[in-house]
């Protein structure tokens, strides 16, 4: 399935921090089937690794692919690849397309909720070397979103 997703659907996604004995981290919840790819990509118990991997790609518009899932920008295409507009998010089962602006808004909300949760629950990542750089990246993305 290759579909263009309306901005409003993405803007209405609910991103929460869950803190239980079974899970600690961000979740994308109450998702329509059209947005399953986003939910599966962003909801992981290994969120520190995911964030380290994708944050600079979001900021610099460089695609990130891990285990056949990820996101790409038109600038990532090789000669002869089928062109597209916006941002492609994909996994082995589905591919969806978002506008550039809604992708930035989504990732800004995701990163801001992550910073809020990690700070509130005093997660170990706050002491990691990469965390300060991530905060700078998140701030730049927030500034891009807010103009």
Model-derived features: where do they sit?
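Negatively charged, low-complexity tracts enriched in Asp/Glu with abundant Ser/Thr
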Residues: 2-68
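Residue-level detector of alpha-helical secondary structure
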Residues: 10, 14, 104-111, 115, ...
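Acidic, low-complexity intrinsically disordered regions
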Residues: 13, 43, 80, 126-127
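Residues that form generic nucleotide/phosphate-binding pockets
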Residues: 16, 40-41, 53, 106, ...
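Short, isolated positions within intrinsically disordered regulatory regions of eukaryotic proteins
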Residues: 21, 51, 75-77, 134-135
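Residue-level signal for secondary-structure boundary elements
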Residues: 50, 62, 66-67, 115-122, ...
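Amphipathic protein-protein interaction modules
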Residues: 67-125
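Short, Lys/Arg-rich amphipathic alpha-helical interaction segments
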Residues: 123-147
């Amino acid at each position: 399935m290759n579909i263009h997703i309306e901005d409003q659907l993405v803007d209405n996604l609910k991103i929460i921090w869950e803190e239980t004995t079974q899970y600690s981290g961000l979740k994308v919840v109450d998702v329509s089937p059209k947005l399953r790819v986003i939910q599966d990509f962003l909801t992981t118990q290994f969120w520190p690794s995911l964030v380290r991997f994708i944050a600079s790609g979001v900021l610099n518009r460089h695609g990130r692919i891990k285990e056949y899932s990820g996101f790409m920008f038109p600038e990532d295409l090789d000669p002869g690849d089928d062109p597209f507009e916006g941002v492609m998010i994909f996994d082995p089962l589905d591919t969806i397309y978002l506008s550039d602006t809604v992708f930035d808004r989504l990732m800004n909300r995701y990163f801001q909720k992550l910073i809020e949760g990690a700070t509130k629950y005093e997660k170990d990542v706050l002491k990691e070397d990469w965390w300060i750089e991530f905060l700078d990246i998140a701030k730049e993305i927030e500034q891009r979103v807010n103009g």
